[in-house]
Regions:
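N-terminal signal peptide c-region/cleavage motif recognized by signal peptidases
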Residues: 9-14
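Mid-chain, structured segments of secreted extracytoplasmic proteins
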Residues: 57-102
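Non-cytosolic coordination micro-motifs
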Residues: 16-53, 88-195
Length: 195
């Protein structure tokens, strides 16, 4: 479990542009990242658009807390250099048990978060939110879990490549479990009003 996250842990690698994750640096090109990760990296024929960035290289089945995640190397559309790293669990696998394992693994690696919040949904069309943020040495690590609130059982609850998690969760609204690593000051803070 911590083997994969051990690569996330501070202190940051030498150099002002270090991301603090697996010896990567802000501004690296897809080609440089591809050389670093070799066969573990998958080049995408069609890049995924993230608005201000795109991902044309991913790592599949990256272990966080004992579960497989996908790592998206988000490249700046203007400079084509590494802008942020997003580590995301597939939507059907983004369930409370997996979220708890991921948050526990992050706390084991980084210690207590700098900022944390939890907001429970109070209406049928809202989503509950759990967010934890670590800020160190010019880098922000943000873990976010949005859970749907409709009280219906999804029969395909947590089916994902390589594992199956049982339990109950809401269905109807898309769930989300992700970890974003970015330069400090570049990430939105859903917890801002509740600090």
């Amino acid at each position: 479990m911590l083997g994969a996250l051990g690569a996330l842990a501070w202190p940051l690698a030498a150099g002002a542009a270090a991301t603090g994750w697996r010896d990567t640096s802000w501004g690296e090109t897809t080609q440089e990242l591809g050389q670093q990760f070799g066969a573990a990296g998958t080049r995408l024929v069609r890049p995924i658009d993230f608005g201000d960035s795109y991902a044309d290289l991913v790592l599949k089945n990256y272990d966080v807390g004992g579960y497989g995640f996908i790592v998206f190397f988000q490249m700046d559309k203007r400079t084509h250099g590494l802008k942020r790293i997003q580590i995301e669990r597939g939507r059907h696998g983004a369930v409370p048990e997996v979220a708890q394992a991921a948050f526990d693994a992050l706390v084991a690696s980084y210690g207590p978060p700098t900022v944390a919040c939890s907001v429970r949904a109070h209406t049928i069309d809202a989503q509950s939110l759990v967010e934890e943020v670590w800020q160190r040495d010019g880098t922000t690590v943000r873990a976010l879990f949005r859970e749907a609130s409709l009280n219906t059982l999804d029969p395909y609850l947590a089916r994902a490549v390589g594992d199956f998690v049982t339990g109950s969760t809401a269905a109807g609204l898309s769930q989300q479990l992700l970890i974003r690593i970015a330069p400090a000051g570049t990430e939105p803070e859903d917890c801002r009003a509740r600090k």
